[in-house]
Amino acid sequence: MNELELKYGCNPNQKPARVFMKNGAALPFTVLNGKPGYINLLDAFNSWQLVRELKEATGLPAAASFKHVSPAGAALGLPLDEVDKRVYFVAPGAALSPIACAYIRARGADRLCSYGDWAALSDECDAATAAYLKNEVSDGIIAPAYSDEALAILKTKKGGKYNVVQLDPAYAPAPLEQKDVFGITFEQGHNDCKIDESLLQNIVTENKDLPEGAKRDMLLALITLKYTQSNSVCYVKDAQTVGVGAGQQSRIHCTRLAGQKADNWYLRRHPKVLALSFVDGIRRPDRDNAIDVYLSDECDDVLADGAWQRVFQERPEALTGEEKRAWLAQQRGVTVGSDAFFPFGDNVERARKSGASYIVEPGGSIRDDNVIETANKYGITMAFTGMRLFHH
């Protein structure tokens, strides 16, 4: 099959819609279940490239959770600790494979934004991954293969309409790519830049310490940024993104947005949050929403009389600003990546507030000296890659 008809394009009024191969070749993917839409497939093919490159760069299973053609999260398949399992709503005693851990961590980076996501796996989708996905709100998944048990589980989601796409892992795109805007065709070379440790050699700060875990996290940040709508900044901790700031016109707004997400990720691990007792039968999205509001300045929306009873078994104490600051002050070892240079040191200042110990960015600003000076002030290790990673 060299063409797949779609219900509509980005919006219901954009008809007809289809995906096809211009050269007449067969499509490199198969729809095993459901009927994916235009944006679903944009998410699928962008997310597949991300997880494929993560696997190539690190040798570890990789997963991503995509929404509107940007990753809400991406991660590698390291084991989950007991706190991770509680924060990510893993069922007690659940079997967890490396690829399942990768997806759970990717979705756990920003559970609020991953609502209705598109999942991407670098490796075969197994029953453990499918069982976790079954209980999450998700639009679809792409993987190079599916076990029989996993496929049977996934086919029960959304009343049997869950989108399951299998992509040929051997497929490689043409070296030139095209897209039309306003009837005008744009053509460019496919972004086939290879992201590996050779990009991390130019350490420009006084602190040259770059442990293996930080190198891995830098690669994760850079590959995530390569497939995130620009401008973009990414915070990574222990082989998973913890905050992705996408599609902002201002670099500092990217850094703030991603930093706020990273702060929320860490605050979800606060003992007061772990102690929240939810009413029986509450759905995961409702728990996520309640936690998000509880951590915000609008916490009274879930703590006021008449409100908390709908969510909690007992009224929790508020997490005070002082408690938040004290908890966040413990956060260290975070890696921050940027798809283009930091123009001013204020980005470093903001990143440091969310625990940044390592920064990777292209360099090339006329204010690089100021950026380096700010990193030196806090003992941050910073590498300049010389490679911009815009994505549109």
What is the predicted role of each segment?
Residues N23-K35, A109-Y115, G189-K208, P285-A307, ...:
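Gly-rich Lys/Arg/Thr-decorated short loops/hinges at beta-loop-alpha junctions or inter-strand turns
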Residues A72, D117, L121-S122, N135-V165, ...:
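C-terminal binding/interaction regions
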Residues A57-S65, V165-L167, S230-K237, L267-F278, ...:
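Flexible, glycine/charged-enriched surface loops at secondary-structure junctions
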Residues S70, C125, K237-Q240, Q248, ...:
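Active-site-proximal loop/turn and secondary-structure-junction residues that shape catalytic pockets
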Residues L220, T228, Y235-D238, G245, ...:
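Nucleic-acid 5′ end/cap handling module spanning
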Residues M1-L199, A214-S232:
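Active-site loops and adjacent core secondary-structure elements that bind or stabilize anionic groups
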Residues A72-L112, V242-F344:
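Glycine- and Gly-Pro-enriched alpha-helical subdomains that act as flexible
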Residues E53, Y227, N264-R268, K353, ...:
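Conserved helix-loop functional segments at active or binding sites
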